């Protein structure tokens, strides 16, 4: 009996170490950033079972077999659609400003199409204005409405948008709504999904959270885009979820969420439509390519307007493109660089690009919320402040609520606005969208918004920062070590 017990014990120990060795080898063999690999190895060797389970659940990018097959199957038809779009040469910009040219060339080479011109843009900073404009556009819709959001929170003006969307569906408008399962959990537990489906709206719960499949698909891979397309002519995107700030997370202690949205008219709506169609097919298996370009885009031709490039990320889209776009924007700056983000946990490359810009004389400012709804990210962000301040970067801490805007402005001419946070999750994992806009007029509008944010912020004093308590420094370094996983 003792011999059997000893044998079982040795086999258990051997299996334990083989499991750790196998996962370690898997981490080392995967192409990933060194800090990320080191963080995972530390977790696994400090808390082996917890670390192994966590790694198998969220350590690798698993879209899931069915979705991965759909992603592969959709590309031949999508590529043909893009080739047809290229034939509409009148909508594509032939040249860009000197500051925007490197970024637009990168996007053209990685995504296969150039930036589109002839768009009209309106920058919107008040949630009421956004929802009122959206309700008007929905009421005037004639053909189709497509929406995707990370969060749809019932209550306030969000309910008015829902009512107008159902009214549109009842009068024959083809309405599709895709919402992230985790972000919109309150919506899917409410009566709204059934009410909408009964009205004729196609409602899809994207990337459903299912603990039974935790090792088959990465559960923290989320649909983080915020997009609206109406009649393939009007489009919205930005940082705002479908929530009324007066009803959203009022008990979080961070104040109302402050967002930015762009309302657009022009061929950019069709460019965004192909992104939506890819997301829809990956999630449902149904193909809904936008109308043929030669029919749909011709009415949009305009002699003037903004030049825009869409940058999409996520499984099935060009890998690392948004990260590359941010690096290119930072290295293109000659006069000033202003970045706004609620969550700041940059890659080493992005941190280096930001600091280098400041060290070569560029006026670099980063605007962050003083209070954050994520304690982990809040502390991890602070770990980068010393290096940024030493390089000459100005850090503004916004005090007027949770600043949720994601924006970058380079030399007053190149603007980036969208859904991308400056953290690892947005840069490497989630489905995201960013608009690159080459236009001085829009840049002036964005600069005015950022100036307003700065007026409601406190500039971080480098001397006072160096005098902060020791326990804060220890906490910052602890969270910094795990920042590649946040």
From Swiss-Prot:
Post-translational modification: Seems to be post-translationally processed from a 53-55 kDa form to a 45-46 kDa form.
Membrane topology: Multi-pass membrane protein
Outcome of swapping residue 283 to G: In strain: ECOR 50
Enzyme Commission number(s) of this protein: 2.7.8.-
InterPro entries per the UniProt record, alphabetical: Cardiolipin_synthase (IPR022924), CL_synthase_A (IPR030840), CLS_N (IPR027379), PLD-like_dom (IPR025202), PLipase_D/transphosphatidylase (IPR001736)
UniProt GO cellular component terms: cell pole; membrane; plasma membrane
Protein function: Catalyzes the reversible phosphatidyl group transfer from one phosphatidylglycerol molecule to another to form cardiolipin (CL) (diphosphatidylglycerol) and glycerol.
Similarity-based family: Belongs to the phospholipase D family. Cardiolipin synthase subfamily. ClsA sub-subfamily.
Protein's recorded name: Cardiolipin synthase A
Gene: clsA
């Amino acid at each position: 009996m003792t011999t059997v017990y000893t044998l079982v014990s040795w086999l258990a120990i051997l299996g334990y170490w083989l499991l750790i060795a196998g996962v370690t080898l898997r981490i080392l063999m995967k192409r990933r950033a060194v800090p990320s690999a080191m963080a995972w190895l530390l977790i696994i060797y400090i808390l082996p079972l917890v670390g192994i389970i966590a790694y198998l659940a969220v350590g690798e990018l698993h879209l899931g077999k069915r979705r991965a097959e759909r992603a592969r199957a959709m590309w031949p038809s999508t590529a043909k659609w893009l080739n047809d779009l290229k034939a509409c040469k009148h909508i594509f910009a032939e040249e860009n400003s000197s500051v925007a040219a490197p970024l637009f060339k990168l996007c053209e080479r990685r995504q296969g199409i150039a930036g589109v011109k002839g768009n009209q843009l309106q920058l919107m900073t008040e949630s009421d204005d956004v929802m009122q404009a959206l309700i008007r556009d929905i009421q005037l819709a004639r053909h189709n409405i497509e929406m995707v959001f990370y969060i749809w929170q019932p209550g306030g003006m969000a309910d008015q948008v829902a009512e107008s969307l159902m009214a549109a569906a009842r009068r024959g408008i083809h309405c599709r709504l895709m919402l992230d399962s985790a972000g919109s959990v309150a919506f899917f537990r409410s009566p709204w999904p059934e009410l909408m489906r009964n009205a004729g709206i196609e409602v899809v719960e994207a990337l459903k959270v299912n603990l039974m499949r935790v090792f088959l698909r990465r559960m923290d891979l989320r649909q983080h885009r915020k997009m609206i397309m109406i009649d393939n002519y009007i489009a919205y995107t930005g940082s705002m979820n479908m929530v009324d700030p007066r009803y959203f997370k009022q008990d979080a202690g961070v104040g109302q969420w402050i967002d930015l949205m762009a309302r657009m008219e022009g061929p950019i709506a069709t460019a965004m439509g192909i992104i939506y169609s890819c997301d829809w097919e990956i999630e449902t298996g149904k193909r809904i390519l936008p109308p043929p370009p030669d029919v749909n885009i011709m009415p949009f031709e305009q002699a003037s307007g903004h030049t825009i490039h869409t940058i999409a990320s996520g499984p099935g889209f060009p890998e690392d493109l948004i990260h590359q776009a941010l690096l290119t924007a930072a290295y293109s700056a000659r006069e000033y660089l202003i970045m706004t983000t609620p969550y700041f946990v940059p890659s080493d490359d992005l941190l280096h690009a930001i600091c280098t810009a400041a060290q070569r004389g560029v006026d670099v400012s980063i605007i962050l919320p003083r209070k954050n709804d994520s304690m982990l990210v809040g502390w991890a962000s602070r770990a980068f402040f010393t290096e940024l301040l030493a390089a000459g970067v100005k850090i503004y801490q916004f005090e007027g609520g949770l600043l949720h805007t994601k924006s970058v402005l380079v030399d007053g001419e190149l603007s980036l606005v969208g859904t991308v946070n400056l953290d690892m999750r947005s840069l490497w994992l989630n489905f995201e969208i960013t608009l690159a806009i080459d236009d001085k007029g829009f840049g002036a509008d964005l600069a005015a918004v950022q100036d307003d944010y700065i007026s409601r912020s406190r500039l971080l004093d480098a001397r006072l920062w160096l005098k902060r308590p020791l326990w804060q420094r220890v906490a910052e370094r602890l969270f910094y070590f795990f920042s590649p996983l946040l």
